[in-house]
Amino acid sequence: MQHEKSLEFLQIAMKYLPEAKEQLEKSGIELSMEAIQPFMNLFTTVMAEAYELGKSDAKSETE
């Protein structure tokens, strides 16, 4: 289950990657896949925690 969610989170990140890359390049920062990898790992960790928080909140609202 967690692996499936991580893949979903990565798909979301990849959806917005071109926009992020454009904004960074406007600021003079080049973005490569090697440079982005640690941030993608951080993103999936944050998204997993946010997902669990939302899941917990939804569960407590239905009780």
Curated annotation (Swiss-Prot):
Keywords: Competence, Repressor, Transcription, Transcription regulation
Transcription regulation found in the keyword field: yes
Keyword Kinase carried by entry: no
Signal peptide: none
Effect of residue 3 to Q: In strain: CU741
InterPro entries: ComZ
Pfam families to which the protein is assigned, alphabetical: ComZ
GO biological process, one term: establishment of competence for transformation
Protein purpose: Negatively regulates the transcription of the comG operon.
Protein name: ComG operon repressor
